[in-house]
Amino acid sequence: MYISNLRLQNFRNIPAKSFDFKNSINFIVGKNGSGKTSILESIYFLSHSRSFRSSQLNRIINHNADEFIIYTKAYNPDEITISLSRKKNSNNISKLNLEIQKNHTEITRNLPIQLINPESFNIINSGAQQRCKVLDWGAFYLDKTFLKIWQQTKFLVKQRNSALKQNYPYSYILSIDKKLCEFAEILDYKRQAYFTKLKPKIYEILSHFNPNLQLDIDYFRGWNLHKSLAQVLEESFNYDNKYKVTNHGPHKADIVLSVSHKPIQDIFSRGQQKLLICALKLAQGEIHNSENDNKCIYLIDDITSELDSIHTLTLFNYLKQLKSQVFITTTEKNKINEFIDTNSYILEI
């Protein structure tokens, strides 16, 4: 997959603009506030039907307009068109090859995106939910049955929490538990299958960036490894009932990152953390590319942030050999001069 043309209308501070890109590394250069991150955001929005910058989508519409439109022409390898529009206080309207989509799933499958930006540090510094999203992104593309299992599991956890809050009888909770355990086991199996591929690939890429970095990467399924979920839910019912929330289950799954049993945020510097994030994201993209025909697109906001020149160059050279489409933003062209070659494309805004 690669994007050949992107058109934006009333998206953020871009009233109307068309951009052409190469199926290689595309540098977007501009001052702060020039709109370079908005270009990355629009591509991400096309894939995910949401922003990585704001949950208040009305704010994304240019203040002089009532609607934004994103349109792209891409190749996968055949030409496809994807568009997304949104009016104020309305829902997104997504189209794939001019056909309105009932949901965004097919577009997401057609447009796999990996984003590396300042908020990516949340994978390390925030709770398990952020790391669990890493597993779910990969499993979604690896296994077409994953989404329905994930949706059903999420629904059952929500239903159980609601029943706890409303003090439903224990017999009713048990009926939910029976279904939840069934779907949770399948979900765990699919996540583990993806993690088995992801872990060695992270180590491989990280050693390329910095062979001296040592860490442990483990998968936690969300409940005791030596007990069934049914047993854990039964044993923890009084605690769950007291706090009116389900404390064990697949919604608590995590990728545990540590050094000698200590959290890596207590050990790694910011630069080392960014190298790990890059290794993780690149690993996800490489696994995707090996399992699917359409290649992952990488969005990197401010590539030089937190990295010295040596590690920035190492990262860039790694990106170049992937032969995937990459979008990189920077505020200063002189910081990327040594990375530019005949295959690169530079957009100055």
Swiss-Prot record:
Task: Say where the protein is mainly found.
Answer: cytoplasm
Per its UniProt record, what Pfam families does this chain match? SMC_N (PF02463)
Keyword annotations for this protein? ATP-binding, Cytoplasm, DNA damage, DNA repair, DNA replication, DNA-binding, Nucleotide-binding, SOS response
Provide the residue positions that the database annotates as binding ATP: 30-37
Q: Which cysteines are joined by disulfide bonds?
A: none
* Subcellular location(s) per record: Cytoplasm
Asked if the Swiss-Prot or TrEMBL record annotates the protein with the keyword Transport, the reply is no
What GO terms in the biological process aspect are recorded for it? DNA replication; DNA synthesis involved in DNA repair; double-strand break repair; SOS response
Q: Which domain of life is it from?
A: Bacteria
State the GO CC annotations: cytoplasm
Stored SUPFAM superfamilies: P-loop containing nucleoside triphosphate hydrolases
Question: What Gene Ontology molecular-function terms does this entry list?
Answer: ATP binding; single-stranded DNA binding
Where, by residue number, does the polypeptide cross the bilayer?
none
Q: Which family does it belong to?
A: Belongs to the RecF family.
| NCBIfam families assigned | recf
The free-text function statement in the UniProt record for this protein reads: The RecF protein is involved in DNA metabolism; it is required for DNA replication and normal SOS inducibility. RecF binds preferentially to single-stranded, linear DNA. It also seems to bind ATP.
* HAMAP family reported for this sequence: RecF
PANTHER family (alphabetical): DNA REPLICATION AND REPAIR PROTEIN RECF (PTHR32182:SF0)
Protein name according to UniProt: DNA replication and repair protein RecF
